[in-house]
Amino acid sequence: MVKLMAECIDEHNAQHESCNITFVMGQECVDILPTKNVGQSNSVCVTARNVEDGSLHIHHATLVVGADGMNSKVRQCLATSSSTIWNSHKGFSPKKFEPKRWTSPASHLRIKVLQLPPQFEIPDGEGKPPIKTKGENIYALRSINTGPRNYLSLGLLPMKDNTAVRPTNIVTRPDHEVWTIHDGPSMRQYFQKAFPRFPFEKDGGVISEEEWDRFAKAQGTRFPHCQYSEGVAVWDDSGTCGVALVGDAVHAFPPDIGQGVNAGLMDVVCLDRALKGLDTVTGKETTVESTKEKTLQTNLERYQKQPAPEIAALIRLARFGAPYQYNQPHRADRISEKMWTANVALHLILSKLTFGLIQPSCILLSQKGELTFRQVMRRADLTTAFFKVMVVGGLGLWVRQRFGFGFLKTVFGVMF
């Protein structure tokens, strides 16, 4: 992606004599403030620190776009700013840039990657030839261990290049035994016991000793909270300069629903539409007279108002969509996974029986590209409300049948 971005920058600079792009690496944001320029438009002053020598650099811009990840320095600067130096939709409040966080069943899971050779072979049963893997196929390899701290699952996602190295994701709870092993030989022996069919032995094994050592020493990363920032854009008093956030700087969540990249790219599309004075959802000319202006302030205000509800719905989908797909091995996880699977299956069956009157679960609805995240969660909420009414109604009928109206009068104090 970095190489592709560099190629796009070079292509842009070659086609335009002015407004060239300067690509700077090794700097991190320290502070962001609006500045007043006499005789010309105001600008945003960005103070950046060189990560190697600590030297400070000043950059001026009309618009600053924060796309610096879930621990965004740009967002943090806005969250610690004075409430008087910026404006925003319905007034600027630094608290709006402090992300709201929720813990999902997938939050805090640890993940690291083991590199397998391309087209490696999976041993089959005795007397059967091994299965040669293909890059375009998905594979899930389960260990013989089934305990809450030693169960392993090797997940391999499809790849276009059949000759490329196959990375396999190791996703576990933080207390898993694999995180207590820090040298290659011990890690190889652990995997050999967990996957006895695979030739993980030292001489001629499917994985090199160098890779085992790298994998054992790797710390990996952790899945984040489900979080989002209510604030996504600000501007100064004059409305001629501002800041906008996109991608993980606005929203971050575990990769359960497979929408992280799509959501980040959609932020860029929405910001582009807003800066062009278009409706951020439809991409069409706005029909509201008050929003037809195309100044930077009105465009950023449009970007703040329209995507914010969509982002909130996205985070709700991430919390409840598919948090148990990693086969978390704790006993409570296994019970919850069965309940989640039953819930998804029940929704799907009832949707078929009622010809779509009852909607499938939100994770299945999210696969319909024509639906926005708000529409997905609205349909899921309607189905949940329907179930609640049915349960309460059924319980009421059972109580009436079992105890009669006298019991209801006593409990609720209602005159029938």
Per-segment meaning from a language model:
Residues 1-8, 113, 182:
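Short beta-strand to alpha-helix junction loop
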Residues 12-29:
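A conserved beta-strand/loop element that lines the FAD pocket in flavoprotein oxidoreductases
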Residues 17-18, 53-60:
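Glycine-rich phosphate-binding loop signature in dinucleotide/nucleotide-binding domains
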Residues 22, 58, 62-64, 244:
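Hydrophobic "anchor" residues on beta-strands that sit immediately upstream
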Residues 25-43:
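A conserved short coil-to-beta-strand element within the FAD-binding core of flavoproteins
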Residues 47, 51, 63, 67-220:
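Conserved FAD-binding catalytic core of PHBH/FMO-like flavoproteins
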Residues 174-292:
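FAD/FMN-dependent oxidoreductases across multiple families
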Residues 213-215, 273-416:
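C-terminal helical "tail/cap" subdomain of flavin- and related membrane-associated enzymes
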